[in-house]
């Protein structure tokens, strides 16, 4: 693949992955609205930027790098949280990157981001139920304890399906929608730098 043959692309993606890992650590609790273990972060901002700049492969690589770094340096979930973040991040940046690559304009970016946000919320609903939360029980948490964290916020929750539907699905969609808005605000300003166009333009003027 041409992406892997371009050293500049690889270095840029590695830097974006490192930034993503830092943003994962700078997460925000949302008390009284979400269970304590669900936190807001914008760690996928570098990933969606990479997906727009270099295609879906770039976005996927940033998701992989940031989660590997977080697993090594800051994980307290035995890798389960990183796996969840990787799944949701890829479900967001891959469709968004494909759509933007095909429709390389602002409308394409909006549609791609919306599709990615919906896809991530949908994928997260099932991946959490069948993969992530069962893995959490292997770390010492019982499923009843997990559901209990939801009932502290909304006592009418009875099942994991309900918990995921009422909390995780809208939270995931809104999180990636906010990430998309931030991307729209900064992408055009940094895109030439990411792709090295600004430097080449300066060199051309000097010549």
Regions flagged by a language model, labelled:
Residues 1-207:
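Loop-helix junctions at membrane interfaces
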């Amino acid at each position: 693949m041409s992406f892997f043959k371009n050293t500049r692309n690889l270095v840029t993606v590695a830097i974006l992955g490192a930034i993503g890992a830092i943003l994962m650590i700078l997460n925000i609790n949302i008390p009284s609205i979400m269970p304590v273990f669900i936190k807001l972060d914008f760690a996928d901002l570098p990933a969606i930027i990479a997906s727009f700049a270099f295609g879906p492969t770039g976005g996927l690589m940033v998701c992989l790098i940031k989660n590997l770094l977080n697993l090594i340096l800051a994980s307290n979930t035995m890798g389960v949280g990183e796996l969840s973040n990787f799944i949701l991040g890829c479900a967001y940046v891959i469709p968004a990157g494909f759509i933007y690559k095909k429709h390389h304009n602002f409308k394409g970016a909006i549609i791609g981001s919306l599709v990615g946000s919906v896809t991530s919320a949908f994928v997260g609903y099932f991946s959490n139920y069948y993969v992530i939360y069962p893995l959490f029980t292997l770390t010492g948490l019982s499923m009843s304890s997990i559901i209990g964290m939801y009932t502290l916020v909304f006592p009418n929750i009875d099942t994991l399906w309900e918990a995921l539907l009422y909390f995780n699905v809208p939270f995931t969609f809104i999180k990636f929608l906010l990430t998309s808005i931030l991307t729209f605000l900064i992408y055009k300003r940094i895109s030439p730098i990411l792709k090295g166009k600004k430097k080449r333009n300066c060199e051309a003027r000097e010549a």
